């Protein structure tokens, strides 16, 4: 998802990346049926906003700065800011307030502490890792792709 959002921003523009930021969590939910997302609908806008942070940061560094390594810097900054945003909003605010709702969606409600611990890692450390991996892949794909897109225009 991160790779797709980044490539959309770089090749089509900010609005396409923002659109994907909104669509991706909903689409993912339809395929995975996450009990956490089902139990706490407030997670959807939080994930959407985290994706948007990545898109806006990459766009800002690419379009509004002029130093040599602006794209790698934007990719790294966007990944870090996304993880921080999601860590604060989801891990420190949403899960402590609404975490008990998850037990209602679990086949074994007694598994709630393990599910919450996993969710805290998923929405912080894992977000950073996947955003950095997506950023690295986007960079590798973007370098030859941008030359092709310039030729086509």
Regions flagged by a language model, labelled:
Residues 1-153:
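Loop-helix junctions at membrane interfaces
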